[in-house]
Amino acid sequence: MAEKPEVLDAVLKETVDLENIPIEEVFENLRCTREGLTATAAQERLSIFGYNKLEEKKESKFLKFLGFMWNPLSWVMEAAAIMAIALANGGGKPPDWQDFVGIITLLIINSTISFIEENNAGNAAAALMARLAPKAKVLRDGKWDEEDASVLVPGDIISIKLGDIIPADARLLEGDPLKIDQSALTGESLPVTKGPGDGVYSGSTCKQGEIEAVVIATGVHTFFGKAAHLVDSTNQVGHFQKVLTAIGNFCICSIAVGMIIEIIVMYPIQHRKYRPGIDNLLVLLIGGIPIAMPTVLSVTMAIGSHRLAQQGAITKRMTAIEEMAGMDVLCSDKTGTLTLNKLTVDKALIEVFAKGIDADTVVLMAARASRIENQDAIDTAIVGMLADPKEARAGIREIHFLPFNPTDKRTALTYLDGEGKMHRVSKGAPEQILNLAHNKSDIERRVHTVIDKFAERGLRSLGVAYQEVPEGRKESAGGPWQFIALLPLFDPPRHDSAETIRRALNLGVNVKMITGDQLAIGKETGRRLGMGTNMYPSSALLGQTKDESIAALPIDELIEKADGFAGVFPEHKYEIVKRLQARKHICGMTGDGVNDAPALKKADIGIAVDDATDAARSASDIVLTEPGLSVIISAVLTSRAIFQRMKNYTIYAVSITIRIVLGFMLLALIWKFDFPPFMVLIIAILNDGTIMTISKDRVKPSPLPDSWKLAEIFTTGVVLGGYLAMMTVIFFWAAYKTNFFPRIFGVSTLEKTATDDFRKLASAIYLQVSTISQALIFVTRSRSWSFVERPGLLLVFAFFVAQLVATLIAVYANWSFAAIEGIGWGWAGVIWLYNIVTYIPLDLIKFLIRYALSGKAWDLVLEQRIAFTRKKDFGKELRELQWAHAQRTLHGLQVPDPKIFSETTNFNELNQLAEEAKRRAEIARLRELHTLKGHVESVVKLKGLDIETIQQSYTV
């Protein structure tokens, strides 16, 4: 051990070319053997070479904190702070220090909350991503074990197999050549072949084969590590960030317009004094900007991401949450996702093709062509049929094992029997095994008949073949292959798959089965799961189908209507995703293998299922840690709840901006009312503190896929904000210009006086604006009536605490610096009552906006035909014709005729009409059977009588 540091020092300084010297010299220089390192030696080398990972630059905590004050919304607040001490310094008054301090305090509070929450979210995300850290099979102390790739050191012996991402730079040892995808490193588009002695780079992907290798470089010393130092990381602006920017810009522009109008009217027209004008501008700046928006939305997303992880879905990309919320098509693997991937073989159904061989011998041959360790589901099922798994290698000596790969779709074992004769046995996809057989033409028809018979019962087929190798060399082709038998494999559906698919459809997510199995198996599984049997072979994707009923349909439409596809290869998955995206669908795709990576990357939401390969996980947006489809649907619901919280807040933020800008601008310009800027700061601080709790609010997920609709957000915000602004103007008019409130409620008057002391009026306006503005969140957070959908207790508690503080300030505060005076409990009660009355129509306004934006209201206004026709059921014939046409087209009986549909009608609406018609018919039938009134009406209709002339009473 004494000489090791010097030798390893040479390796550390890269003075030895380990990539090109002979493999034996590699072992000599690394002071290791083919039996691997000991755990002690590995630990010593870890202290020399460091962990096998790229160290990220540590960001300064202080600079990160300041970064939260560096965005367009914060810039506006910072401009307001400068205005408070620089511009608001005239008219015989000192600078507005209280507003300056208040603004800075508000900025610090928001930045602190953002910093703490993002730091917590970052720590949680790091812990979650640690669960996804790549693993490596490494030989230590003479035993193979799975370790984190980060603890690999030069000299370790590792195992590389299909789907693995190479964990470190290494030299290959004896074994079959690998197909390595180095496109991420070298730009080579095609996989390259690497044999024994060749070097492989960290970060490349194994596309085919299995082999052992010796690690020669780790961490920053790898080819990938050196390249990473030369490249700066790039931050891609996501859709979420664009939406955030758009909403922020809308609010800033609204404030700018209000300020420009105020400047034009106050100074050139009204000839107002300088200082009051600046104060009014500060009110719009401070009150209108949604300074908490980045914090609220980021915190909501981070908390939601953590909740998803608890449900078994780890989000690698935060913005995948909003895409998951909008997903309307999910292309799901069958095996392992819709089914258990726990295969069973019915020995009684085994179909033997070779003479003199029984079912037990077939099982033994299939077991020999299986792995004893590190098994897949098929290996487990086959070897599990033996009385003792050791029987699979009993009496033979293994020479060479060919692992499964997507190209050959089979495994094979070359072995020596007790007499020293060499044999080879193979199992795999029936077509591949059949192609090996020397008598393929004689048995092909029978093989396909058996396969179809199995498939009709939902059983997969596994072929087994055997050959002798008289040459006695593992490289030799051997004698003729003999097709031995077909084994039936049954993969039972998950107990919750059918219910989950039904839930998905109710949520507007269409689940399509994507399977590599036969069409008949796909249809049988679809039938059992209740997802439909409208499935097609993969040849239909290429327009090569011979089925005349679907040959006339465009491929895009075929994919959109299909319940699934069978016989699918990874390249077909990519095509399916591309076509669905072209039809404006938000598409999710599940995958587990290395060849699924392109489709997972192409999909809007790539989902790596439980036990997926490193390559699939790397390409995905979401990694599942639990098996089954139910995890995905639960993640969809959670994502929609997260999205709903963000959407609720953005509508609220826009509403408050419009409400503050329009309301205070009108008060300033009509009655020359100067509201104290400091009180707007108090409103902002209390509002922001309360609104932070919306990230944990109880919400109802949307029943349909969600997406950012900026027109809806802006329209709803402008209308609700405009309504609240007008109610404040009306309240001001009633309190200032009339004696309505004193006459009705017996409170002191706030009417206009000779001195026009606005102090009490300012307190009244403060309380009116504060309470109704914050109460608006209960309207924007609910889809139906706000008093029906129960909010989270934290939000309710925060609201009442904030408004209790606001009420106490309005009742008791006599702050000369803020120009307010207490109004007493009488006025406080009047204002709360006024705001309750103001609150009631908000839900109705929300419903009207939603109805108007849906387009249906405009159809009625523009067409005007329904209102003026004498027909009782206008357009009934056209609707019936459209529905019948849609049904015939959906079942492939008729080519779609675009002329028959109006611009506002589509297949989905017609299908919905059809479903509603079915439900109405069923309700009518049950009503006729089970109610006396229904029975009487049925008889009257059947006899052709007029019910008005029948003088008898009946009971409902």
Swiss-Prot record:
Residues 1-65, 119-247, 296-646, 698-713, 781-792, 843-956 are cytoplasmic. The active site is at D333. One of its GO terms (biological process) is proton export across plasma membrane. One of its GO terms (molecular function) is ATP binding. It is an enzyme of class 7 (translocase). Mg(2+) binds at D592, D596. Belongs to the cation transport ATPase (P-type) (TC 3.A.3) family. Type IIIA subfamily. This is Plasma membrane ATPase 1. It comes from Solanum lycopersicum (Tomato). The lineage of its organism: Eukaryota, Viridiplantae, Streptophyta, Embryophyta, Tracheophyta. The gene is LHA1.
